[in-house]
Amino acid sequence: MGATGSSQLEKEISTTESVNNANEHYYGLVNFGNTCYCNSVIQALFFCRPFREKVLNYKQTLKKSGASKDNLVTCLADLFHSIASQKRRVGTIAPKRFITKLKKENELFDNYMQQDAHEFFNYLINTISETLIQEKIAEREKASRHGTLKKGNVTVNLAPATAGLPRSDEKGTSERNGGITVEGNEFLNKSDTTTWIHEIFQGILTNETRCLSCETVSSKDEDFLDLSIDVEQNTSISHCLRVFSETETLCGDQKYFCETCSSKQEAQKRMRIKKPPQLLALHLKRFKFVEPLNRHTKLSYRVVFPLELRLFNVSDDAEYGDRMYDLVATVVHCGATPNRGHYITLVKSNSFWLVFDDDIVEKLEVSSMEEFSGMSTDANIQMPPGNQSAPQKNSESAYILFYQARDYAADDPNHNHKGKNSTHSV
């Protein structure tokens, strides 16, 4: 971003910004060759204030302890601190150290090809969580060298940040989202395997199954750090979440084995939210394999996303069942395929929105948000008869949405939910 552009944006921001938000910084990130997938997620997480504060606190804690570490978390913390401590409010910064560390840690990202922003998001939060857990293990080992907790032979089984894998309450199995097994089949306390990643992003789904013969209802809980939901043409986030929790009938070869009946029976099952997370990360499944093309392509369906969201697909015993969410950031994919295109980020800073396009930062009118919902007709997968290699139209479509719980932001002076934003219920 040039000096003229930076000063102009700074003037625009100063005229609309509240006093509480006067110390916020808006810095574009340099693209090191198709690293927009990384830049877009970093910008989104930077403006998820609970996440940013935890990252900055991590750096401060290390500084106080005098410890010197070189991992992906410290690289991210240094980047966040560098942005937050700049003298100018607006500018550009190069995340070179973070990108270098990322490529060194994971060969998937060690190239100049376009990567999937959602895969990077999953990798980042799981890596942070695993690092924090390992640090807790090291601290406990150091504090209990003469205790019952033995040193060495420690295995960290960190679950992926997606819904759908079972929680295990049985001793001897790895627990969901960070079960720790130590020598002698001993388990660390749950507090040792719960990190601030879980505190911020983790929710609980409950899979309810009702036998249609005896009416017995069984349930199974599953932790999640984000939700991946299917998309349909000309719909909304509310509709997609309703479909996610639709009742499914199990019959024929899919019959359910009922413990009460001791036999396979027809049943109905549905997935509902038992514990809504503090920060809800929604991933729209926009990429699918198309057989005529023999490759993955993009579903540029128009899916309207609200600025305010209330979840109603919750279980009867749900914690915070009436929780209201505010949209704080959106990662947008521009292009026709997973491996081609570009990522940008829309973020909310107090009373206004901005768009981050690598090193370019611009204000965004709320009225323009709908332009990033996708296309009303999906030109990407429609092909003229006899022509399977027709040109594909690009589109700007919301890909990852970050909704922050309003009660979670109650003490955040920079979070303002006043205004005439649309509210959609699920």
UniProtKB/Swiss-Prot annotation:
Expressed in a number of tissues including the nervous system, pharynx, body wall muscle, vulva muscle and intestine and is detected in many head and ventral cord neurons. It is found in: Perikaryon; Cytoplasm. SUPFAM superfamilies: Cysteine proteinases. One of its GO terms (molecular function) is ionotropic glutamate receptor binding. Residues 27-406 form the USP domain. The keyword Protein biosynthesis does not apply. Disulfide bonds: none annotated. Disruption phenotype: Decreased levels of glr-1 in the ventral nerve cord and corresponding defects in glr-1-dependent behaviors including reduced spontaneous reversal frequency and reduced responsiveness to the nose touch assay which normally induces backward locomotion. Increased levels of ubiquitinated glr-1. Its EC number is 3.4.19.12. The keyword Disulfide bond does not apply. Residues 162-181 are annotated as: Disordered. Its main location: other. The active site is at residues 36, 342. Keywords: Cytoplasm, Hydrolase, Lipoprotein, Myristate, Protease, Thiol protease, Ubl conjugation pathway. It comes from the Eukaryota. It catalyses: Thiol-dependent hydrolysis of ester, thioester, amide, peptide and isopeptide bonds formed by the C-terminal Gly of ubiquitin (a 76-residue protein attached to proteins as an intracellular targeting signal). Interacts with wdr-20 and wdr-48; the catalytic activity of usp-46 is increased in the presence of both wdr-20 and wdr-48. Interacts with glr-1; the interaction results in deubiquitination of glr-1. Belongs to the peptidase C19 family. Regulates the abundance of the glr-1 glutamate receptor in the ventral nerve cord by promoting its deubiquitination and preventing its degradation in the lysosome. Contributes to the regulation of embryonic polarity. This is Ubiquitin carboxyl-terminal hydrolase 46.
